[in-house]
Amino acid sequence: EKVARIASGRTNLQTYGDTMFTEKTPLDPRSPYSASKTASDMIVMAYGETYKFPFNITRCSNNYGPYHFPEKLIPLIIKNILAGKKLPVYGKGDNVRDWLYVDDHCKGIDMVVSNAPIGEIYNIGGFNEEQNINIVKLTIDTIAKIMSEELEYQKVLTTDLANINYDLITYVQDRLGHDARYAIDPTKIVTELGWYPETPFTVGIEKTIRWYLDNQAWVNEVLQATSHR
């Protein structure tokens, strides 16, 4: 069967280092994990060069939204808030990440596959850099507001509503090789393909929270499955 096009995409930005980067920025991984991600790009490009496979590569910022695995920052915060558990924040919480709603990311990938010249690389970013501590506080505030105004959602709480506040935040030691900022420049996909993220972060985070509130059965099923690993 003929291969129409290979699209390789990932969410790890440590490939470049810690400055604002474009698609032409030299790859500069800082950890074994990010080196493995960089290697995947290099393999795709090597196959394209050697065997003339049609390909595109996308590199995106941190995704969030429905079906995000519960161990990741935003769903972990949501899960812990509902249970009244502490919210671990690395370092002082001042690490900065760019956040991209998953639906916007999917539309960007589709646009690359459908319209981009073969062999081109595109950064897909959310134009939404935030400190981790601000993400945590916004999530606390949003859940508290929903629970106060829509009482039917309180059935998913295993703690008192009064416990949903900033006292849940606890600062933990930052992990080795953790970059202070992942700064992505998605100008190329905006100017060449006309893509732009449609979801403001405050809208996206509320949609995400509501999805998790409405899909606790999925969350529990995933957590139960991972506990048997």
Please state what every model-predicted region is:
Residues 28-30, 62-63, 170-172, 215:
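A short, structure-level motif marking secondary-structure boundaries and short turns
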Residues 1-57, 64, 68-70:
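Catalytic helix-loop patch of NAD(P)-dependent Rossmann-fold dehydrogenases
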Residues 75, 81-229:
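C-terminal substrate-binding subdomain of Rossmann-fold SDR/epimerase-dehydratase oxidoreductases
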Residues 15, 62-68, 94, 114, ...:
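Active-site proximal helix/loop that lines the substrate pocket
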